[in-house]
Regions:
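Structural/interface elements that position substrates and couple domains in central-metabolism enzymes
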Residues: 1-99
């Protein structure tokens, strides 16, 4: 399974949905893991950390192309078009989106 991690786009969100350690375990279990370049920067996790874990560093389009997409925050309206037939694992925070 290809598991992908796009960078978070919500203002002031510095977390990333998957650490290099977690990615390493998924890779060891036979999964392909792709992380958007710079996605871990706000959490002091470098692209080199992910590369050492066996992750492929990709652009935003590829980061949304996985069989399973991991995010911390709910998708923003700008990200809605990227929600096609993929599985998304995230917190939805539905009440936070109320007008």
């Amino acid at each position: 399974m290809r598991i992908t991690v796009p960078a978070e786009t919500k203002v002031a969100e510095t977390r990333v949905a998957l650490t290099p350690e977690g990615a390493s375990e998924l890779v060891a279990d036979g999964h392909e893991v792709w992380v958007q370049r710079g996605a871990g920067a706000g959490s002091a996790l470098s692209d080199d950390d992910y590369a050492r874990a066996g992750v492929s560093l990709v652009d935003v389009d590829d980061a949304w192309s996985g069989d399973l997409v991991l995010k911390v925050k709910e998708p923003t309206p700008e990200e809605y078009p990227r929600l096609t037939s993929r599985a998304l694992f995230t917190y939805l925070h539905l009440a936070a989106n109320e007008p």
